[in-house]
Amino acid sequence: MAFLRKVNQVLLLLLVLTLCGILYKKVHKGAVLKDKADVDSESPEDMEEEIPVVICAAAGRMGAAMAAINSIYSNTDANLVFYVVGLRSTLPRIRKWIEHSKLREINFKIVEFNPTVLKGKIRPDSSRPELLQPLNFVRFYLPLLVHQHEKVIYLDDDVIVQGDIQELYDTTLALGHAAAFSDDCDLPSAQDIHRLVGLQNTYMGYLDYRKKTIKDLGISPSTCSFNPGVIVANMTEWKHQRITKQLEKWMQKNVEENLYSSSLGGGVATSPMLIVFHGKYSTINPLWHIRHLGWNPDARYSEHFLQEAKLLHWNGRHKPWDFPSVHNDLWESWFVPDPAGIFKLHHNR
């Protein structure tokens, strides 16, 4: 009897230990799952949305990109990540400029653009050879350079942002639209500027309507053009509509047929986008793309108008870091000196 009693006691002890083990595992597992669930449920609410801004930093005008970045970062509290795109030879210099200047606090990623993707897609003849530089076509390849974002802002390097970039990012893109641009016809004070510097703002200025391929598009030559120097893009739609492939198709057609007008000298990258996005893009608030500051050194906007502008764009030959140029004081206030001493301002010659 004593032996059986001891056996029963041992079995009872083992049973109690087993039950305790099972109970511990359940409680511990439940706590772990609860913690994980809490993290998963809280993170989307607590995590501030990241705004990706893509900007190119070309070797000869790297100071432009740094000034643009400085103006964007200084005028917002938004959570930004800058994708600074360059050719392989310039990447160390880009990093040094950022890390050894006031820009060291920004969140950034340096992205290499491989120009071999452009082989056979660019005609060598242009009235403005600088527009044939590989980085001018980075905007065609946004989904290949930025992978983890649904919505992306692309900016030319010769811009200064005076508003909160969050406003531009909040631009509504209509269903089925892969991008938003600013129309050339809805720019405040645009008519005065166009008359003054002789600019065109229609497809006629970019496409050669003498060519059958252009005529067959059925696009009226008087259709208002847009400027792709400021883009808000939906990456899902861009990939779904195979925008990059479409743009490459029209680049190759131009190589074969010389389809684009050289009258403005700016149709190299703009013209394919005008064709691919015709009637299929949303619009940006005009104040978020005040342009033509670089077309004529004698053409000036009013100071009041410039103060209202959210973004200034010196598109054209006359850049604000060079001479002659206009409104360069607005640009120079955001200039970040080159730690290597290579990029210099040339305002007084």
UniProtKB/Swiss-Prot annotation:
Transmembrane segment boundaries: 7-24
Organism: Mus musculus
GO molecular function terms attached to this record: UDP-glycosyltransferase activity
Cytoplasmic side: 1-6
Annotated family: Belongs to the glycosyltransferase 8 family.
Organism domain of life: Eukaryota
Glycosylation (residues): 234
Lumenal side: 25-349
EC number(s) per entry: 2.4.1.-
Topology with respect to the bilayer: Single-pass type II membrane protein
Keywords: Glycoprotein, Glycosyltransferase, Membrane, Signal-anchor, Transferase, Transmembrane, Transmembrane helix
Protein name per UniProt: Glycosyltransferase 8 domain-containing protein 2
Coiled coil ranges: none
Subcellular locations according to the entry: Membrane
GO CC terms in record: membrane
Class of the enzyme per the UniProt entry, highest EC level: transferase
Major location (coarse): membrane
